[in-house]
């Protein structure tokens, strides 16, 4: 019968009901060759037939860990002996990470912050982003020193001011100086030495965060562009820009942006005013209004509609009009105003203005100044041959259209 290998290993779960043979000691068995491991070892005396079976080693608590008897894993090697435990397990692969004193003298948080600054500088240099900007490694941290902050609009305005003063070369040199300063500071932050790291960390820890400027209407907002921090002339008018009304300008006389000093007197509602040519930005002309005259505040004088500080709503600058004073509702347009108004439109405007109480103006006409326009027709004796030819033709010729009313015999109702 086949010998049960599980019984030899001591883990047969069928016991006496096993189909294979469980060898026992005693008579009727083949001649025994004696015990395999002696009196105190193993599973006892076994036959020569099963002498080649490899027996599992017997582990004892007394010999595990090394006791000098040569059993188990102890013996000459003394593996795991109490005297050598410290020598075997003294090396810890994570001991460098758990060290309380790093080799460079910086904590993990400080080293992470320094690595972040160096990485940001490399990204900033290769990305081609706007160079005249401030920098902070994290939210809540103060800005790193050495970087000037100017917007593209401020740099453009400074160019206009220098160009108006024929000082473009100074502008170019100043911008190149700023670019070189920024490049040097960027390279310094990319490869910081020990003293530079300490200086940067102390700056990020001990610097005082300045309060943000007020951006609301009525608040003062001064730009640093044009100040001594920018190496260009400080004559720029952008430094005085404010949403606050200029106290030197009387209430109600604030001119619109880009308008000349001739338009400082505000026209009333719907009045035709004289045209004005706006001065270019940064022309340097002292008579041109500065940015400080720009204001969102209304006039201090509260009166009827059309008297606010800004130019009147609905007002238009007619190229052929010389009137700067409003016409009353009941007034009839005269020849001096250079405008014409039909009877129907005059009555309609009078009714509308009478209901609202606002001043109105007459509609502009193509008739030049000095020519009366209150006639409905012109006698033939006052017309030239060319004008009569145009009135008698079926269509007017472009460039030869008469500026006078036609004769009465050519009026068809």
From Swiss-Prot:
SMART domains xrefs: ZnF_C3H1
An example Gene Ontology molecular-function term: nuclear export signal receptor activity
Subcellular location field: Nucleus, Nuclear pore complex; Nucleus membrane
Source superkingdom: Eukaryota
Region feature Disordered, mapped onto this chain: 252-293, 321-369
UniProt zinc finger (C3H1-type) residues: 1-25
InterPro entries per UniProt: Nucleoporin_NUP42 (IPR051767), Znf_CCCH (IPR000571)
Keywords: Membrane, Metal-binding, mRNA transport, Nuclear pore complex, Nucleus, Protein transport, Repeat, Translocation, Transport, Zinc, Zinc-finger
Entry text on domains: The FG repeats are interaction sites for karyopherins (importins, exportins) and form probably an affinity gradient, guiding the transport proteins unidirectionally with their cargo through the NPC.
Record's protein name: Nucleoporin NUP42
Species whose genome carries this gene: Gallus gallus (Chicken)
